[in-house]
């Protein structure tokens, strides 16, 4: 559920990441039409016209408990996160990717530094010319705004141009169950 390349699972297990977005993949011609979503917040119906529609179900539902595991490389005998962990979905929203607020970017795992924002695993290409933050894991790229850091993360995870295409997403708030 979370991308370990950018240490997102670790952020969940430490309580620093409390929100995630899942891209909705369907035929684009339906996404230009009108839509309605059910009161439970688990399904959206897109209507292309009076006769053509498509239902898109949320992969997760309100109150669902989901197991969170670390990649095997990190899960060792001395690892305190080696025990089973779960999160509980506390809110579901349906929105466009670029509708994310600065506050929600931080809930997604973007971190605040004294001179900008960064994401674990997104390193600078040229530390002499780019703003960066030096950490134990290397020189991480600094961004002036949380949305810019999040947009870069999304494009690295899902492919170049994903942020710019502004797809619909399921946005989930969750709590770590101790």
Predicted regions: what they are:
Residues 1-178:
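Secondary-structure transition motif
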